[in-house]
Amino acid sequence: MATAKYGLEPIGPQKPDALVKFDVDPSNTAIYRGDVVELDADKGVAQAPATNVDNIGVVVGFYDADGLPALYYPAGNAAGYTAIVNIDPHQLYKIHYYHASTALTAADVGSCADWVVGTGNTTTGQSGAYVTSLGTGAAGLYVLGLYEQQG
C-alpha cells in the first residue's frame, strides 16, 4: 500500500479556539486535510516533511481565494488559499499504520513514529500520510493507544 486512507484524523471534539486560519504558502506543494504543516516564514503554512520538529498543527479544512470551502490546496502557485489548522497540542489523532509483516499490538503503546508523506487524494481531499515503522527515540508522533475501527 503506497498511501493511507486519511492522514491524521482528529479523534473526539476539536476545540473551536484551537482551529486557526493561516494563509497557505503559494509556492508550496499540494496540501490535504490531515497533513501536518509548519509555518513558512511570512508566507503562511506549508506541508511539513516527515521528520520535521517545528510543526504548527494538522490541516482540517481549506478556503479557496473566493472564500469558498475547498477539498485541498492544489500545488502550482495557487494564490489566496486559507488553511484551517488545529493547533491544539492535546488533540488526539488516528493515522493509518502499514507494515508488510508486523501488525500493531498493545505492546506498541508508548512507541513513537514519524509519518510518511504520501500522495493525497484529489477526489476526497484526504491526506496520504501514514506510519510505517515505530521506534523508541524522538519523533513527531506517539502511540497512545490502538484505535478500534468499527465495520
Per-region residue spans from a language model:
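Surface-exposed, low-hydrophobicity beta-strand/loop segments enriched in small/polar/acidic residues
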Residues: M1-G151
